[in-house]
Amino acid sequence: MMMLSKSLLSAATAASALAAVLQPVPRASSFVTISGTQFNIDGKVGYFAGTNCYWCSFLTNHADVDSTFSHISSSGLKVVRVWGFNDVNTQPSPGQIWFQKLSATGSTINTGADGLQTLDYVVQSAEQHNLKLIIPFVNNWSDYGGINAYVNAFGGNATTWYTNTAAQTQYRKYVQAVVSRYANSTAIFAWELGNEPRCNGCSTDVIVQWATSVSQYVKSLDSNHLVTLGDEGLGLSTGDGAYPYTYGEGTDFAKNVQIKSLDFGTFHLYPDSWGTNYTWGNGWIQTHAAACLAAGKPCVFEEYGAQQNPCTNEAPWQTTSLTTRGMGGDMFWQWGDTFANGAQSNSDPYTVWYNSSNWQCLVKNHVDAINGGTTTPPPVSSTTTTSSRTSSTPPPPGGSCSPLYGQCGGSGYTGPTCCAQGTCIYSNYWYSQCLNT
């Protein structure tokens, strides 16, 4: 997800005796491999369903990790995406989790109890609960540090980060530290170069060259696991010309998925932030599946969410993904859970809470459909339901007006009711959005 509230999770209450006793029995596990445009997970080739749980990496109570993973696994989900980064520039207060402190005078990778040892337990628990993890190394956004923390330490900006020698040297040191800890763990589904990498206004060659070099480096460290980019799928010539299909954010999905040292493609979908309607997402899935099919690799629909009527609007995306050649799996944003002490996990408007009606629709029903069950997701509504921040139709290709709050791809746009071509007066940095002025 692009932007999350910044919060470092503090310690929770101790585990109950019952939770300590009820330990799952892990099945025989193996490294994930690829078979055509699908994945082989522990000897079974097919389509998988998964979720995102970025906050799982920062839980200090092991019982909370175990209960969350128990709920995810028992729901039939196979893969969980967790953050593998937590970058800071100054020493946090005691008890707060941080993985890396970045400084031009000497950076520190935290392997202590308030550092990578918390991620150690996440990997251990995933092994126990028969789950696989996708772990990104850096965030494009400033949540949990991200590229901005590197910029604070080594200078430059978010676009020069990809070619900044000092920043890239430290990034690779961190990659090596993380990969070396888990290179032999069958709980790792894939290493991810970053969460939603962008290079606004850059040639798409910048990210292609960076992704090629870094993915080759990761492969040199670990030949057991898959590697992927972690991009949103922005930049694709086969779409309708709406903002997400354009190349202003410096990414070219078709080029990226063709990189030999990347094993599969990823893409995300957020109509509420992109100025598109919900049904538009079905075509977005199909065009990316076609690009992956052309590359001979699987696509993973890695993040998606709808702020309004999630069951009605997201279930058709799941059906489209499941039934489209080239798709290997999907992972909704994001999992929500309640811990033994009654506290709830971090959440946002897209959260699907365990045991909720949306969980029944988007998790249990979807898993049943994958496993050949008879559960039928709700049909696409005959009338398009959109957020108040969403246009009823995608922005017209090459037009002079994009919907209010629709992303304008970094170009100069302004206007009281829509993004009209001109000079940008107020832009939302996080989502490249044209806002009301």
UniProtKB/Swiss-Prot annotation:
InterPro entries registered for this protein in UniProt: CBD_sf (IPR035971), Cellulose-bd_dom_fun (IPR000254), Glyco_hydro_5 (IPR001547), Glycoside_hydrolase_SF (IPR017853), MAN-like (IPR045053)
Region (Linker): 377-399
pH-dependent activity: Optimum pH is 5.0. Stable from pH 2.5 to 7.0.
Active-site feature positions: 196 (proton donor/acceptor), 303 (nucleophile)
A GO BP entry: mannan catabolic process
GO molecular function: cellulose binding; disaccharide binding; mannan endo-1,4-beta-mannosidase activity
Residues engaged in binding substrate: 196-198, 232, 274
Region (Catalytic): 28-376
Catalytic activity: Random hydrolysis of (1->4)-beta-D-mannosidic linkages in mannans, galactomannans and glucomannans
Biased segments, Low complexity type: 381-392
Signal peptide: 1-19
Propeptide: 20-27
This protein's GO CC annotations: extracellular region
Purpose of the protein: Endo-1,4-mannanase that catalyzes the random hydrolysis of (1->4)-beta-D-mannosidic linkages in mannans and heteromannans. It is a crucial enzyme for depolymerization of seed galactomannans and wood galactoglucomannans. Active against locust bean gum and ivory nut mannan, releasing mainly tri- and disaccharides. Also has transglycosylation activity. Transglycosylation of two mannotrioses into a mannohexaose is the major transglycosylation route.
Quaternary assembly: Monomer.
Family: Belongs to the glycosyl hydrolase 5 (cellulase A) family.
Protein name per its UniProtKB record: Mannan endo-1,4-beta-mannosidase A
Species of provenance: Hypocrea jecorina (strain ATCC 56765 / BCRC 32924 / NRRL 11460 / Rut C-30) (Trichoderma reesei)
Gene that encodes it: man1
